[in-house]
Amino acid sequence: MAFVHYTVKKIVHGLGAIKEAANEVKNLKGSKAFIVTDPGLAKIGVQKPLEEALTAGGIEWKLYAEAQLEPSMDSIQHCTDEAKAFGADVIIGFGGGSALDTTKAASVLLSNEGPIDKYFGINLVPNPSLPCILIPTTSGTGSEMTNISVLADTKNGGKKGVVSEYMYADTVILDAELTFGLPPRVTAMTGVDAFVHAMESFCGIAATPITDALNLQAMKLVGANIRQAYANGKNAAARDAMMYASALAGMGFGNTQNGIIHAIGTTLPVECHIPHGLAMSFCAPFSVGFNYIANPEKYAIVADILRGDDRSGCMSVMDRAADVEDAFRDLLNDLDIATGLSNYGVKREDLPACADRAFAAKRLLNNNPRAASRDQILALLEANFEA
């Protein structure tokens, strides 16, 4: 069966790679760079190396430090308006998934008429976006490698995505030095998010030989390095491996979609303000427990990676696959991530609406290895409300 594989145009990877930022702006024929980040990063000055690199290279820049944790349609429009007023010819996303998603969505509106909700769905954007550089400061979302921007749907609740080949970055800069100061909590939940991206793509219906290779390597890197990065944020080797893993996973799931973990995790109540990576983390164990019987060969591999042990010579495929839920729970325990939706502000009366929204997320469920009804999703939520 024929398949098509897309990815970003250019990757600059390595410790200290941020110093190449001005050259990359010039390579895109730009001279005025609009930097999008969030208030928290700007407050502690994580973006300073980027600003210094641009200034040293003669690039005029403006900092927009208003990216929201859960980007809304209004916030995307505001970012776009500010970039237009500055006269930006290149937009740079600097931060975690929210800042990068804000940047990608704004890059669309800088070349296409808004509002952004016109483009919720797949390949509805008519014109190429403004040249875009993405620089992640976490190792998890993989947003820098994908063609999707996930936004809060303030009209209908939950989150929705704009998916378009025009949303691939022109250049991605991967510099793990930018992650050295991440708190352990953020390291944990973004790292698990990277693993979930790779796993859902690897086990999903749309997997290809190329995405399998990318996702398998990503999972191995996360499995071997996430605990070390969590325990010691200055571990350069572990940090670089996690940054690389996140990018590989992004290249993987960006070509296949995710599955039921994302279908559920992205439809939890917006007012709970649950970080994306955290939602993916605590939704993962019960979701893989539901899924594994549909693709035991691959879930056996996932379980072995989580355990750090190839058990193919001493356990059956089904026994290894059946261990995947417990193996995931053990990882979360090591990273001090609690399971149970009630721990994160979700109320029991929220569950039916969550199930409705998750079941409506066909873009995600269509790639899930096991078909899931609305009632099955609700049963999973209820069973794991206090788990």
Curated annotation (Swiss-Prot):
One GO biological process term: alkanesulfonate catabolic process
Enzyme class, first EC level, given as a word: oxidoreductase
A GO MF term: metal ion binding
> What drives induction of this protein's expression?
Up-regulated in the presence of taurine.
Q: Which InterPro entries match?
A: ADH_Fe/GldA, ADH_Fe_C, ADH_Fe_CS, Alcohol_dehydrogenase_Fe
Disulphide-bridged cysteine pairs: none
Kindly tell me the pathway this chain contributes to: Organosulfur degradation; alkanesulfonate degradation
Per the record, the domain of life is Bacteria
Q: What is this protein called?
A: Sulfoacetaldehyde reductase
Q: What keywords were assigned to this record?
A: NAD, Oxidoreductase
Instruction: Kindly state which reaction or reactions the protein catalyses.
Output: 2-hydroxyethane-1-sulfonate + NAD(+) = sulfoacetaldehyde + NADH + H(+)
Function text? Involved in an anaerobic respiration pathway that converts the sulfonate taurine (2-aminoethanesulfonate) to ammonia, acetate and sulfide. Catalyzes the NADH-dependent reduction of sulfoacetaldehyde to 2-hydroxyethane-1-sulfonate (isethionate). Does not accept acetaldehyde as a substrate.
Q: What EC number(s) would the UniProt record show?
A: 1.1.1.433
Additional comment? In contrast to some members of the family, a metal cofactor is not required for catalytic activity. Taurine is an abundant dietary and host-derived molecule whose metabolism to hydrogen sulfide (H2S) by members of the human gut microbiota has many prominent connections to host health and disease. The human gut bacterium and opportunistic pathogen Bilophila wadsworthia produces H2S when respiring sulfite (HSO3-) released from organosulfonate substrates such as taurine and isethionate.
Q: Give the UniProt family note.
A: Belongs to the iron-containing alcohol dehydrogenase family.
UniProt keyword Oxidoreductase, yes or no: yes
Query: Which gene codes for it?
Result: sarD
